[in-house]
């Protein structure tokens, strides 16, 4: 792992509350930025944004994923419009990278205000399940609400109610899932990711698959290489399953509904017969 520019003209701090660098995960090149809440609260400022945008620029040139490890107090007020401009440049970098390289973000601490928008622009968002906070406006900003009543910034709410978070867990499990995700995704939109080494037999029998048709996670596990299934947005609307699997080394996206567990949850393109 190599750390990139430590000093980008900032007089505030040698790191300006974010560490940027690049390295490999299972032989795959990745670019990473990690916000440091112990320095200026990890807040977004002009140089902070420049360091992250620099990482995006390098990742786009090399065609490699960007991973963001977030712990940000939000906008650095003392930098005023310069900090606001920094958010704008970050959003532009993310928009230009969308559909070109994978963007993965993991929220380990606070992710408030403008940084929450950046998390929403990522392709995959992870969130630490106990102490992480993700919000544009704090829970107390909602009329009649307070944090103890309904913590709209917590991982449970963001994963179950809004669907803004794809995966939750402790720090170790999140890092492990990110490593797994990087290993099954193409590095960019032009990479020939047709096949990876696969020891599983494509033509093997899936005995008993007819008995698990009502629970697609089990069915997908049976047809996938080495029974690998990575379910996305697992907590959000459990009657539907979205997942990534591998078949003969090829990564495949899957969508299915759990008819066995939620047999009454049907999708209608016209008004439901029950409404008649």
Describe the predicted segments one by one.
Residues 1-9, 14, 268-276:
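Single conserved hydrophobic/aromatic residue that forms the stacking wall/gate
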Residues 70-190:
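Conserved catalytic cores of soluble enzyme domains
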Residues 33-35, 67-70, 106-108, 127-129, ...:
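Generic beta-strand/beta-sheet core signal
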Residues 10-11, 15-98, 103:
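Long, structured ligand/cofactor-binding scaffold of large enzymes
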Residues 51, 177, 269:
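Charged catalytic carboxylate motif
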Residues 32, 59, 71, 117-119, ...:
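Hydrophobic alpha-helical segments that mediate membrane insertion or helix-helix packing
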